[in-house]
Amino acid sequence: MRPRHIVLFIVCCFVLLGAIVVVGDWCRPMLGGVRCPHILAVFSGQQSAVSDQQSEEQTMVPLELADSTSLELEVRSETADADRVQNTEYRVQNTEYRVQNTEYGVQAVGVLDKFIEGLQEAGSKQVRVVHYGDSQIEEDRITSTLRTYLQNEYGGLGPGLLPLVQTIPTRTVVQYLLIDRQRVTAREGPKRYFVYGPKNQQRDSSNHYGIMGQVAVLDSLCDSVTMHIEPYGKLTSANYFSQLRVWATRDILVDGSRRHQGALRDTLTRLNIDISGIGEVYGVSLESATGVIVDNIPMRGGSGNVFTKMNRKELTDFYAETNTRLIILQFGGNVMPWANTEERVRGYAYSMRKQIRFLRECAPNASILFIGPSDMLTVVDGEKMSYPTIAYMDQQLARISAAEGTAYWSLFKAMGGEGSMQVWQEKGLASSDGVHFYRSGANRAGELLWQWLKRKIDD
């Protein structure tokens, strides 16, 4: 090709490109919604700002979590949507939610109705509450207090779901594994994978983690274990159970049978469960056939952005089969060291909308309750104080919850707001790390949660 032809071809390309930019809005329907950059951005290498409220900027932000667990957090920075929830009505999946201001922030009205309706059935069927959270709920903290109140009020027995391998002792049951009648450590038991935490503990190509976000794999190296359960401390309703369910793949045998659920011979407080075969175990539930069952599912180091990485069918089937009427999400604390600007706070809050929507699709008959982080302490210029953005984080999580038709409880405000963690430390309710509660503090937080929830139920 001759040089003048090459030059002519290049000029034609620029003319065509300029024409596309000029008529960008007119041609967008024919381009499948593609947005053309401004012509100046093409030459300068910069993308012009887009005013469309539906546009999203997605970044992968490396995040060092408070629990010393590294992961990458997908953050969608959408200032317009984050601020838009100040309005009084929102349309979510063709449903309008009326919003009111409360002592715990903006709240959508009627969003606990499905849970409250479910409680009316607790006398004749099982009603389930699934409590997900970060390390603040480890050891069954907060959950156990809420469970006790709910079971005392509406009936129900048992601690609910337990992982096959328990590495973090709980305040409710003593649990360990036996192989050939010998007690073994978690390292000596089946291989485990987690949807949260370090990458080397996650599965390479499968999203089968079950309802708890973790799976124990029985294989030729470990194909038979006995799970031992006995009560811990003072007996409560959570230590009695009359029904067993094992959530596992079909080839797993429970006490030599392929039947994975059924009534026990009596109401028990201790049990040995023989589990064998080649397959996967997602959880073991000790429960009753009626009343309220409350599951404690801590995800150490988690920010709450993992549910969309889990298997949709497994979650959907579990929530439907167990009549799950309330899903509690208690997250946000682990992102505070990173969320040191308002933009980052809004980005994290917006990212949680995707998780809420996903869980609502999986559990259409359940209410969703988001619990924000507690007050948390850091050191600024040598002085111990609350994280500077903790109040803003609480506000933004309340707003996105209202926008998504999700209930919100502010643990931060229930504690007393900014600086309250120091007060709780002085009262012996919180640890010296300025993040976690002692058991007494977790009991108090659980009581405050129940008092708030009971008012909602009675209203």
Locations of regions flagged by a protein language model:
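Alpha-helical scaffolding within the catalytic cores
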Residues: 107-118, 307-321, 353-358, 391
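Sec-exported extracytoplasmic/periplasmic mature domains
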Residues: 120, 137, 141, 147-155, ...
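Conserved SGNH/GDSL esterase-like catalytic core that processes O-acyl groups on lipids
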Residues: 138-242, 253-350, 436
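Hydrophobic membrane-insertion alpha-helices, especially the h-region
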Residues: 7-25
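Short hydrophobic beta-strand that contains or immediately precedes a catalytic carboxylate
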Residues: 129-133
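Short, basic, low-complexity termini and linkers enriched in Ser/Thr/Gly/Pro
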Residues: 41-64, 68-107, 459
